Amino acid sequence: MKVAAGAAAAGPLSAPSSARPTIPGGLTVPGGSTIPQPPSRLARDSQLQRQIRFCRTPAGVRIAYATVGRGPALLVPAAWISHLELWWQDPAYRAWFAPLAGVRTVVQYDRPGCGLSEPWPGRQTLGTELEVLQAVADHLELDRLDLLGASMGAPVALAFAAAHPARVARLVIYGGYADGHRIATAEVRTAMIAMIRAHWGLGSDVLADVFLPDASTETRAHFAQLQRGVASAQFAAELLEQCYEIRVDDLLDQVVAPTLVLHRRDDRAIPYRLGRELAAGIPGARLVSLAGRSHFPYVGDAAAVVRAILEFLGESVATPSPGQPPGTLTARQLQVAALVAEGLTNRQIAQRLGIEERSAEGHLERIRQRLGVTSRAQVAAWWARDAADR
């Protein structure tokens, strides 16, 4: 895998560089919005240290991408609005990727005009998405890769797999669709785009409720603020419009890579029926139906999603056994430990992760057993010390 360093740069959809606002840490954001800080300072796990670098598309647009982990490449197309640095500060988001990064080099990127990537000179389309994905893959000299397409990244991954059958080894689709027109009625689609364009504050709140119905009120509010901070109303409206316009249903039968389709049955953003139809159109694809309403995989039963992906990739699930050293925690246990370190109660942890309070209690008890400690304070101390330094 080739890696090349570059100079940091980010910008709004149309404002000149001199107009770009900044936040502490030197992050540039679009539209003059203020980025909220995370609820508390988060400890870092050395196994999840990412490297952010930059490459250029054939059109000369600079794209920010991040790599983390080890092993063969797992390329993850942009799913929605993103910011490589800010999203990684979420302990639940970071912990969800931990098992994947243990067996794959996970590659993510910010789409043009979003996060740390430069804006695209014109309206973005599926062709734009494919050009960016290929630019990242070519820059890293990935002749063979696995793809994980989630949400809006799903049709992009599908189209790339259809166009490059010799390059894609395995394809995972989560919460995906093949025809954006079928996500909602024309009236709903038009109303959503108009609301976001005219009232981005309300629109970002509505999207947070749709994407994260099982998360706590605090988590949804924080995510809504992040959306407003890293994307302008115009950018968000155009991106949602693009989401609704994308169609790749005529390409499904051209996908030859082994394909796993994961979809939560009560997904509030992308209806389950679209995942089922998508799987039916891909030769030999396997459909796995999951419980839950949240669209994002790291909320709700995140472990079930990771487990299915690892099994499909031919990797064992990283679950501690009696022979493993103390301090080895599952992805879910790492999430709980991080939230304990934030000072959250079991009830608050359950609300944040979209699980039952008794499940949070059970996770905490197993964490204490694995770490050989007896109190929440000791768990928090372990997270602040060992997870940051080992």
Q: Where do the protein language model's features map onto the residues?
A:
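Conserved acidic catalytic loop of the alpha/beta-hydrolase fold
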Residues: G127-L145
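Conserved HGGG/HGGXW glycine-rich cap/lid loop of the alpha/beta-hydrolase fold
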Residues: F54-E118
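Acidic catalytic loop of the alpha/beta-hydrolase fold
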Residues: R265-I270, H295-F296
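Conserved alpha/beta-hydrolase catalytic His-Asp/Glu region
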Residues: G201-I246, L251-L252
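Flexible "cap/lid" loop of the alpha/beta hydrolase fold
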Residues: L158, A162, V168-A198
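Short beta-strand/loop motif that positions the catalytic acidic residue
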Residues: V255, V261-H263
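Catalytic active-site module of serine/aspartate enzymes centered on a nucleophile-bearing elbow/loop
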Residues: A285-Q324
